[in-house]
From Swiss-Prot:
Location within or outside the cell: Nucleus
Gene field: RAN1B
Protein name, as recorded: GTP-binding nuclear protein Ran1B
Keyword Isomerase part of the UniProt annotation: no
Compositional bias (Low complexity): 187-200
Region span, Switch-II: 59-75
Primary role: GTP-binding protein involved in nucleocytoplasmic transport. Required for the import of protein into the nucleus and also for RNA export. Involved in chromatin condensation and control of cell cycle.
Region (Disordered): 187-209
Subunit structure: Found in a nuclear export complex with RanGTP, exportin and pre-miRNA.
MF GO annotations: GTP binding; GTPase activity
């Protein structure tokens, strides 16, 4: 069992993402002391069951930062931004700093959500923060279930210390609410891979000029 904290600006799709996992949604518990919903997300691996206790902020981040109680004892994390809203990516370093102040040296996945939406403001090749901080990055679409399992598989492998760990069955997910243009998305992922071999820009802002 691992405590997984999910952070990022309000409206980036954190709650939508967590709710895709149907048994976790069914068994969630509200923790009134810190105002979070905790979803137990089970994944079945070749090494047995792994449960992530997923802490969802329930929108408190709209009123400023999150209290330390949210982060304490976090064993892994997802930082989420919305590829259709540039500001949510610009705020990723702040979320990362807040997280690392309380949780040192935990595996972190950066997720760019809503890649099903046509007019992206944050292009795949503009996402460089994960390279500076040695995080894993995935493009996801919560509403279409695209890449839903990827962040959890990465974190499970890191936490288990086993790069060969794999899921042996898929969790029950809510049916897709939107369709994703897979050909276009594969093009974005190819751009992302190509960008990874380029030197990092000196300044984050120049990617958006």
């Amino acid at each position: 069992n691992f405590k997984l904290v999910i952070v990022g600006d309000g409206g980036t799709g954190k709650t939508t993402f967590v709710k895709r996992h149907l048994t976790g949604e069914f068994e969630k518990k509200y923790e009134p002391t810190i105002g979070v919903e905790v979803h137990p997300l089970d994944f079945f691996t070749n090494c047995g069951k792994i449960r992530f206790y997923c802490w969802d902020t329930a929108g408190q981040e709209k009123f400023g930062g999150l209290r330390d109680g949210y982060y304490i004892h976090g064993q892994c994390a997802i930082i989420m931004f919305d590829v259709t809203a540039r500001l949510t990516y610009k705020n990723v370093p702040t979320w990362h700093r807040d997280l690392c102040r309380v949780c040192e040296n935990i595996p972190i996945v950066l997720c760019g959500n809503k890649v099903d939406v046509k007019n992206r403001q944050v292009k795949a090749k503009q996402v460089t923060f994960h390279r500076k901080k040695n995080l894993q990055y995935y493009e996801i679409s919560a509403k279409s279930n695209y890449n839903f399992e990827k962040p959890f598989l990465y974190l499970a492998r890191k936490l288990a210390g086993d790069p060969n760990l794999h899921f042996v069955e898929s969790p029950a997910l809510a049916p897709p609410e939107v369709q994703i243009d897979l050909a276009a998305q594969q093009q974005h992922e190819a751009e992302l891979a190509a960008a990874a071999s380029q030197p990092l820009p000196d300044d984050d802002d120049d990617a958006f000029d």
